[in-house]
Amino acid sequence: MTDEPGVAAAERRGFRQRASGFALDITPLRRNPAFRRLWFGQGISFIGTEIAEVALAYQVYQLTGSTLAVGLISLTHLVPLLTLTVVGGAIADAFDRRRVMLVQQFGMVAGSLGLAGNAALSHPRVWPLYVFQFVISAAFSIGVGAQRSMTPQLVDESHFMAASALNSVTSQFGAVGGPGIAGLLIKFVDLKWVYLGDSLSYMGAIAAVALLPRLVAREDADRPSWSSIVAGFRYVRSQPVILGFFLVDTNAMIFGMPSALFPAMATHRFGDPSLVGYLYMAPAAGALLVSLLSGPLRHVRRQGLGVVITASLWGVAIAAFGFAQELWLALVLLALAGLGDQISAILRSVMLYRITPKEMLGRVSGIEFMQVAAAPSLGNLEAGALASATSLRFSIASGGVACVAGCLLLAAAFPALLRYGAQANAEA
């Protein structure tokens, strides 16, 4: 006679084991107190930043009534991004990365306090909003190379995949939850308190980073200079795998980034301008889902091929989104696009950590972030221009098709990317 309770218990254990295989691997948080402190500190800081950016856009529009004035905020991000990120990467490779990130966070505190002070005035001015946001963006750009190159110094190589997924959770959670929290705060509290809360979030990051060990790439590293910055670009050009996945992602973002068209899609395709928030949220929701269920990614061996496939998935989903007539289908397709993009991002991070020597990682991470942040802006420009000349459907659908075609061409041009695997350093 079968022991039914024993069979049932075994089935439950088997189900739990299968389910745990999909769950986010939190081993780096459990085993590495330094990484845990950095992760929590960055998470708090990121959510505060997302909230403050929504509040800033709201305040600029309230003071000016101009969408152009709101759009000009992007220049306070783009200019430091294109000019200071690679400089900051060279600084991160020359000095203690912990100290570089502390300077970054203190600079962001100063900018946030400036925004709070302006908001506390009886008649807030517009120009300080741009000045203080530029200060925040400049500080962030200088420190982002150090920030993104800390993980491989704090985590064992066998846990790079898990650490990359954990890092993506904080950014995607902020992207999904930050705007909603900002909306509630704007409704119920004065803006100065929102900005003060942002400054406190940076203080949380400062407290976490201050407790980290000293993190230097090399004790005898050269001082940052123009030649050291150029060396970073030369290194990227000399590495076909890194250059290949940089170009694959750039291709996907330039041809397949339709977010500038979301307001028009909500208004003209779905008949309700208020639905635009759901369109913006859907890709982030798909990306967050991937991060939370990223366990199977540790079994991916041919990570370069994975980047090409998931970038192509983004393109296919975006092309289909261009034809979607129902809101639910549009949201599913955008979430699927976000899912593909996030898998690609995690795989790219792991490859970057494994290939790049630590004395070059700050510069390469800075170049990568510049590419990741700038390419979507170019993509939105392309999508908007093409839509104005043709139609929403053609702009979005053709962009998705061009993304897939570009991925296939780049895969053929960079066979080393397709061959890249990490069998020797496979996840445990």
Give short role names for the model-derived ranges.
Residues 1-428:
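Alpha-helical transmembrane-bundle signature of multi-pass membrane transport and export proteins
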